[in-house]
């Protein structure tokens, strides 16, 4: 499985690496709206990895993102490396 995709969702998990590890920032994003209504057996999770970065300002658990990039399957989870991203703010009522 490999292809270009545009996805949006909320960051559910952030991987913190030891200082001695090769720098990369990895998070898991879940499409919460789809997850709530879907009954298709899929988990609607996407791993995002930025190579060479220890953190990305503004991207943390709870942040809503729209991402674009190539998706491949790694360790059973769809993964996007160095995606383009847009932080989506919470709409005020």
List the predicted regions and their residue ranges:
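Well-ordered beta-strand positions in beta-sheet-rich domains
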Residues: 8, 43-47, 77-79
